[in-house]
Amino acid sequence: MSIQSGEILETVKMVADQNFDVRTITIGIDLHDCISSDINVLNQNIYNKITTVGKDLVTTAKYLSAKYGVPIVNQRISVTPIAQIAAATHADSYVSVAQTLDKAAKAIGVSFIGGFSALVQKGMSPSDEVLIRSIPEAMKTTDIVCSSINIGSTRAGINMDAVKLAGETVKRTAEITPEGFGCAKIVVFCNAVEDNPFMAGAFHGSGEADAVINVGVSGPGVVKAALENSDATTLTEVAEVVKKTAFKITRVGELIGREASKMLNIPFGILDLSLAPTPAVGDSVARILEEMGLSVCGTHGTTAALALLNDAVKKGGMMASSAVGGLSGAFIPVSEDEGMIAAAEAGVLTLDKLEAMTAVCSVGLDMIAVPGDTPAHTISGIIADEAAIGMINSKTTAVRIIPVTGKTVGDSVEFGGLLGYAPVMPVKEGSCEVFVNRGGRIPAPVQSMKN
């Protein structure tokens, strides 16, 4: 395939002017060989394995970034869900395991480590429950550990006992961490994927290799610039522009991933195509939708525009890589997207509209600040609604919601860095407490019967 000089200049502009970057190189590490009935031995085994497998990740990323001139923003680690790994200890708390993950991740210099997780879509083992109840204290006493809970799937339905506990866990975490910041490191999933490189929801699935490299790219600014500079008039033409741009973005990510795999001698897993925004101007998914013809993100037509964007990104990315996986779509995290923040502050982008948008994109209600007095059962209800969308549509959905203690609608909260800031958004006045407290399981839908 011949490369034109114009295409080379396009790639240079992507990095220099349009905020293109490789968002993360994530090493997934299997911890099954660390299992011990003694929690102290387990912690030592975990520390040793992470610091051995991941020791060269940061230096490799810096080398590749310099070699190719492409920023590689984060280096991360994901591990096997700790509820599985710590079960043999029969401990009544896994906070020490979270602290070990934190210590190991800091020792090798990575940005985040994910996998303080439990998969409870069909039921909770004693270990799962211990882990979930350990999350608030774990988030309070660690800095870069991320946690996730998978409470439902298309095949299993929704575990409402776990949904209730997840809502209480988020609420408790908000109460004991400054401005609820610990909740920014907790994701509650339906249909969680095993090869996600993005935080806070990354964990290393049990069906994965001993270690694997997963890469996430980010290029909302590139897509917006491509639309600004194109002569596309119809939405068919808009989709074509997005598709071609996604192809170019993906090729860069594929190159970085394969090179990292070779240098680290770890198999290349997947490339996640997700358009991941940042709070920086010019790096917003919302502004892409507005470029398509919306006056403000969140107005009528937003869900349709997002569906077009998400599908075109996937089509372009799939052509560029044979290893597409993870979440692969367009993220809509309110606090991490300058355009979403503006739309929410204007009162146009609401929680209800965001929920509708999650039906057509990845991944879910993300980085949304709500009043600090929001009850736990309301958080559980929001989680259940989002899980239902994922369950029925056979897609990954998730909730990362932050009840901000002492704040109410009209206030805003600053998280800093890539997490940005967010206006506090209202939740519904009515109560779902009786519904949530019923417990049990919402049965798997008829779509689950595929054999």
From Swiss-Prot:
Species assigned in the record: Neisseria meningitidis serogroup B (strain ATCC BAA-335 / MC58)
NCBIfam families: PRK05313.1
Protein name per Swiss-Prot or TrEMBL: UPF0210 protein NMB1652
Gene3D superfamilies: 3.20.70.20
Assigned protein family: Belongs to the UPF0210 family.
Oligomeric form and interacting partners: Homodimer.
InterPro entries referenced in this protein's UniProt entry, alphabetically: UPF0210 (IPR007841)
Pfam families for the chain: DUF711
Domain of life: Bacteria
Entry-linked HAMAP family: UPF0210 (MF_01221)
